[in-house]
């Protein structure tokens, strides 16, 4: 049994958290303390949370700590933090995803991430 466990054991685990879970005057600077403990982050893309300034700050802080960056997409529901039901057609959902991932990619390109 030990031999089987050794062959299937996980050698590395990506310890991940969400960042930029704020917008405007509603800041959450405590979340940046997590950067010392994670290997990657998902940065909110501005629809359920995040705004351009918050997104930029989160990505730059992740870069400082050498933490990998991913996109945390969400529904266009900032008041409900993305938790309320949203009805979308398939092409609308696709556009929503492309738009949000594009925003993160643009920040990454602009700041050399």
For the regions a language model picked out, list residue spans one by one.
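Glycine-rich nucleotide/cofactor/substrate-binding loop typically near the N-terminus or early
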Residues: 60-86
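Active-site beta-loop-alpha junctions enriched in small/polar residues
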Residues: 18-22, 44-48, 74-80
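A short alpha/beta connector and helix-capping loop motif
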Residues: 23-55
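Glycine/small-residue-rich loop that forms an oxyanion/phosphate-binding "nest" at active or ligand-binding sites
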Residues: 78-111
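N-terminal basic/disordered segments at the start of proteins
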Residues: 13-27
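Hydrophobic faces of well-ordered beta-strands that scaffold small-molecule active sites
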Residues: 13-17, 41-43, 69-73
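Acidic (Asp/Glu)-rich catalytic clusters
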Residues: 32-36, 57-70, 112
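Charge-biased, low-complexity intrinsically disordered regions
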Residues: 4-8, 23, 105-106
């Amino acid at each position: 049994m030990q031999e089987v466990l050794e062959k299937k054991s996980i050698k590395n685990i990506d310890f991940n958290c969400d960042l930029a879970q704020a917008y405007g005057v509603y800041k959450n600077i405590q979340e940046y303390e997590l950067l010392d403990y994670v290997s990657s982050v998902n940065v909110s893309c501005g629809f359920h949370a995040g705004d351009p300034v918050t997104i930029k700050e989160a990505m730059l802080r992740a870069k400082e700590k050498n933490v990998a960056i991913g996109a945390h997409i969400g529904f266009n529901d900032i008041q409900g933090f993305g938790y309320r039901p949203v009805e979308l057609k398939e092409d609308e959902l696709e556009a929503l995803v492309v738009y949000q991932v594009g925003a993160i990619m643009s920040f990454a390109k602009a700041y050399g991430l």
